[in-house]
C-alpha cells in the first residue's frame, strides 16, 4: 500500500491461474496519473480460476477490484470474489477531499469486466459502500453473477450505485440473486442501472 509509484496492490500478470488471495487488505495505492491504481487487479492478462476470499480494498485512487478486459489481449479467466469488502475507493486516506479543485480517481468498488467481453465472474456475499463511483458494475461484461451482495451509499460522483450494462445488441446473461442496494436520501447517485429482467422478490 501507499506511494505514487505504485499501481495495484496485488495484480496478476502473464496469465496466472488457480490462485487464492485470502484475508488481505489493500489500500492507498496510487499511480502518478492518479487514475490507474486499484486495490486488487485481476485484469488484462489474468488466467482462469483465480479467487479472492475475505479481502478488503479501500482508499485506492482507482477501483477496489478491477477485472478489466480489452479486445487487444482478449478475454480473461473467470474470477471469483467472495466475502470481500470494497469501500471509499477514489481517494486516499491522506487526501484532503475538501481542498479546492480536488480531483477524485475513478473509484468503483467492484469493477467486473470491460471491453464488452465475457468473463463469467462471480461476486458472492460481498459488501460495497462509500465508493466515489459505482459500488458494483459489470463495466460492459455481459455474463457476471452477483449473489447475496449489498451496496450502500455509493455513487458520490453522480453515478449509479449498481450498474449492469453492455451493448444493446449483446445477449445479457447476468445472474443476480439476493442483491440489496441502499443510499441516503441526500446522496446524488442516480437510480441503479439494473435491467427489469433482474428485478425480483430477492433483489
Q: Over which residues does each language-model region extend?
A:
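Extracellular beta-strand/beta-solenoid scaffold signature
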Residues: 1-14, 31-46, 59-73, 94-115, ...
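Short coil/loop residues immediately preceding or within conserved phosphate-binding loops
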Residues: 16, 47, 52, 118, ...
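Small-residue (G/S/T/A) turn/hinge positions that recur once per unit in extracellular repeat modules
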Residues: 16, 46-47, 76, 142, ...
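Predominantly extracellular beta-rich ligand-binding scaffolds that present long acidic/polar faces
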Residues: 83, 116-203
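Short, solvent-exposed beta-strand-terminating loops
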Residues: 91
Amino acid at each position: 500500500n501507499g506511494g505514487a509509484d505504485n499501481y495495484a496492490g496485488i495484480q496478476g500478470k502473464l496469465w496466472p491461474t488457480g490462485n487464492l488471495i485470502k484475508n488481505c487488505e489493500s489500500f492507498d495505492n496510487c499511480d502518478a496519473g492518479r487514475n490507474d491504481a486499484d486495490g486488487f487487479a485481476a485484469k488484462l492478462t489474468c488466467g482462469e480460476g483465480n479467487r479472492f476470499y475475505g479481502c478488503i480494498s479501500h482508499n485506492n485512487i482507482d477501483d477496489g477490484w478491477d477485472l478489466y478486459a480489452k479486445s487487444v489481449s482478449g478475454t480473461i479467466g473467470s474470477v471469483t470474489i467472495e466475502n470481500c469488502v470494497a469501500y471509499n475507493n477514489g481517494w486516499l486516506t491522506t487526501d484532503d477531499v475538501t481542498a479546492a479543485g480536488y480531483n477524485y480517481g475513478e473509484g468503483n468498488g467492484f469493477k467486473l469486466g470491460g471491453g464488452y467481453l465475457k468473463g463469467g465472474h462471480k461476486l458472492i456475499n460481498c459488501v460495497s459502500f462509500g465508493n466515489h463511483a459505482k459500488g458494483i458494475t459489470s463495466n460492459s461484461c455481459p455474463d457476471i453473477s452477483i449473489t447475496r451482495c449489498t451496496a450502500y451509499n455509493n455513487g458520490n460522483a453522480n453515478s449509479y450505485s449498481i450498474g449492469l450494462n453492455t451493448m444493446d445488441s449483446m445477449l445479457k446473461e447476468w445472474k443476480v440473486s439476493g442483491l440489496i442496494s441502499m443510499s441516503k436520501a441526500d446522496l446524488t447517485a442516480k437510480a441503479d442501472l439494473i435491467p427489469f429482467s433482474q428485478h425480483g422478490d430477492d433483489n
